[in-house]
Curated annotation (Swiss-Prot):
Biological process terms in GO annotation: cell division; cell wall organization; peptidoglycan biosynthetic process; regulation of cell shape
Protein name listed in UniProt: UDP-N-acetylmuramoylalanine--D-glutamate ligase
Reactions accelerated catalytically: UDP-N-acetyl-alpha-D-muramoyl-L-alanine + D-glutamate + ATP = UDP-N-acetyl-alpha-D-muramoyl-L-alanyl-D-glutamate + ADP + phosphate + H(+)
EC top class named in words: ligase
Pathway(s) the chain acts in: Cell wall biogenesis; peptidoglycan biosynthesis
Source organism (scientific name): Bacillus cytotoxicus (strain DSM 22905 / CIP 110041 / 391-98 / NVH 391-98)
Top-level taxonomy: Bacteria, Bacillati, Bacillota, Bacilli, Bacillales
Record bears the keyword Cell inner membrane: no
Length: 451
């Protein structure tokens, strides 16, 4: 960890606890800051807040009183999920108090360089692929951000010869000031998180912050097939490395002759890749580009691609019951992810979908329903909207239920020999579950109860 004295004896407000706030508060206290922790959850049933209080921090729970800003606050470190429309953040902005997220704090204290990976879909898969390729290539990677350990904790322990591979959300990237990844990858952009950002444009601009502080000594890995990503990355000062699944890229990564190439050199043949789904070729091209830029040998990249079958909750094979294959794609929290999941199958699909209503309509799914879906069982807040889209698609079997466990039972009842039963919600999980991981685990448990 760098020697950091900027926070000594400064009053710093950590807004929102969860994993990132808890880690940030502990880090700041270790750096000599006077840490004030604020969380909306009452202290009586807030275990993390109680732990921080026991460590001598000033903890205020049960609301976000504006009076906190009267304590000569030098900096606010906010939980990524708390919107900037929160009255406390609005008041802090008016007082010109800097507001950052935990990833910015991690960058400021890290000895190791960062790799940042963002996009609407494929972040987790690409981050894991990158980590595995760097590990195979003996580049001493550590993984942090939305997956793995909280970035602050990893950054504290990281040495200069390591590299931090981070999956970054738009929420995290809105709160960066000096964050400068050595390599920044922008995978794709799809309309998502409208409840937080308001418009696709604002969402895209938040993602593009990943390039904000890059210089000519850095690299920007960009999806050349995504017009929005190309536009949003146009002002990046990093060396641009493009990747494409549809056209040849001389100075980047592409597909030709049934193989993946980087800067004109064949790296791996597609037949050697075990990760299913055409969409995953984009993720592989991005990860391969990062690995090659850091000097990983082709042999190491090929070794990873011959064994990497995917990440949990992303098109995860669960089991086969009476020749019905079950797949868990709980990480599909937006429409594009579900489109890509459906496109991965040639067998008839019984789709389980639904969840938090973020204001999206689901008409974009209609052609995928028509081509791939035999029946749909919906649940959660968005069930009526999904039913409407399924009716437009002319699906013969459409059913809405209240809970995921019931949806699993009904999907199985509608299935036949050779069908795929797929959980790919196209929605966030927070209407009924704490996380998409919890949703996926409950799906898996419900499937095993059918046996």
């Amino acid at each position: 960890m760098k020697t950091v004295t900027d926070y000594q004896n400064k009053n710093i407000l950590v807004l929102g606890i969860a994993k990132s706030g808890y880690a940030a508060a502990n880090l700041l206290k270790s750096l000599g800051a006077n840490v004030i922790v604020n969380d909306g959850k009452p202290l009586a049933n807030n275990e993390l807040a109680a732990e921080l209080q026991a460590k001598g921090m000033d903890v205020v729970c049960g609301g976000h009183p504006l009076e906190l800003l009267e304590r000569n606050i030098a900096l606010v470190v906010k939980n990524p999920g708390i919107p900037y429309s929160n009255p406390l953040l609005v008041a802090a902005t008016e007082k010109q108090i800097p507001i950052i997220t935990e990833i910015e704090l991690a960058y400021r204290i890290s000895e190791a360089p960062f790799i940042g990976i963002t996009g609407s879909n494929g972040k987790t898969t690409t981050t894991m692929l990158t980590f595995e390729m760097l590990k195979e290539g003996e580049k001493h990677p550590a993984i942090a951000g939305n997956i793995g350990t909280v970035a602050c904790e990893v950054a504290q322990a990281a040495k200069a010869n390591e590299v931090l591979v981070t999956e970054l959300s738009s929420f995290q990237l809105m709160g960066v000031e000096t964050f400068q990844p050595k390599i920044a990858a922008f995978l794709n952009l799809f309309e998502a998180h409208l409840d937080y950002h308001g418009t696709k444009k604002e969402y895209g601009l938040a993602k593009a912050n990943i390039f904000k502080n890059q210089t000519a000594a850095d690299y920007s890995v960009i999806n050349a097939d995504d017009a929005d990503v190309m536009e949003l990355s146009a002002n990046s000062k990093g060396q641009k490395i493009l990747f494409s699944t549809t056209k040849e890229i001389e100075d980047g990564a592409c597909i030709k002759e049934n193989a993946l190439y980087f800067k004109g050199e064949k790296v791996v043949e597609i037949k050697d890749i075990v990760l299913p789904g055409k969409h995953n070729l984009e993720n592989i091209l991005a990860a391969m580009s990062i690995a090659k830029l850091l000097g990983v040998a082709n042999e190491a990249i090929v070794a990873v691609l011959k064994r990497f079958t995917g990440v949990k909750h992303r098109l995860e094979y669960v089991t086969t019951i009476h020749n019905r294959k079950f797949y868990n794609d709980s990480k599909a929290t937006n429409i594009l992810a579900t489109e890509k999941a459906l496109s991965a199958f040639t067998s008839p699909v019984i789709l389980l979908a639904g969840g938090l209503d973020r204001g999206n309509e689901f008409d974009d799914l209609i052609p995928y329903f028509e081509q791939h879906v035999k029946a749909i069982v919906t649940y959660g807040q968005t069930a009526p909207k999904l039913v409407h889209a399924a009716e437009k698609a002319g699906l013969a079997i459409i059913e809405a239920v209240h809970h995921l466990e019931e949806a699993v039972e009904r999907a199985y009842a509608h299935s036949a020999d050779g069908d795929v039963i797929l959980l790919s919600p196209a929605c966030a999980s927070w209407d009924q579950f704490k996380t998409f991981e919890e949703r996926g685990d409950i799906f898996i448990q419900a499937v095993h109860k059918l046996i």
